[in-house]
Amino acid sequence: DLVRSRGLGDVYKRQGQLISHKANFDLTKVDLCVANELEERHEYNAWWYCCIPIAVVRPDNLPMPIFIRGDDIEYGLRNCKRLVTLNGICVWHEPFESKYSSSMYYYILRNQCIDNSMHCPGYDANALKADLRSQVMGEVNRYRYKNADLLIRGVRDFLKGIDWLEQTDAEALHKEIMAYGYKAQ
């Protein structure tokens, strides 16, 4: 199959939502191959899919220490202002959905909060509360109470600020988060 499951070059919206251009295009269809070549405005591309000028990669402009989910989003939004996508070039990897881990709930929401605070001027306390409420209730309704706790902890840790993030032993935190969540089966 030549179906593009995800478009390349995303538009970043409030609340950490990435809107992917040209997702699910069946590239065996001529009209979709032509449409795939149309230029679109995009603000982000995953760094594992980009050639970033070496002048950008400097000691004073490194990625934030928020590895696992969202680190490439923040770095891409900050540095990759002019993106060029080329038809036929792709990266094949396991879909994120099949890499389930409870710990991701912590990292995804915490890191979305960090990204939004830096790149979405309209992201305020009300938006944060709405995000948290929606995601926590979704997990509670599925009886995934540990995931709900991890979401709340992610927001609490975000609210501790940059000093806390810089001083935290990321490896120890990760071990703690991994030990708390549900184990994949």
Predicted regions and their residues:
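Terminal low-complexity segments of carbohydrate-biosynthetic enzymes
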Residues: R110-Q185
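Gly/lys/ser-thr-rich phosphate-binding loops in alpha/beta enzymes
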Residues: R78, C90, S98, C113-I114
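A recurrent flexible, glycine/aromatic-enriched loop bordering the glycosyltransferase active site
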Residues: F25-C50
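Donor nucleotide-sugar recognition loop
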Residues: N45-Y49, I54, P59-L77, R82-V91
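Single conserved hydrophobic/aromatic residue that forms the stacking wall/gate
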Residues: D1-Y12
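Active-site donor/metal-binding and catalytic loop motifs
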Residues: L86-S102
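Extended repeat-based solenoid scaffolds, especially LRR ectodomains
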Residues: D10-L32
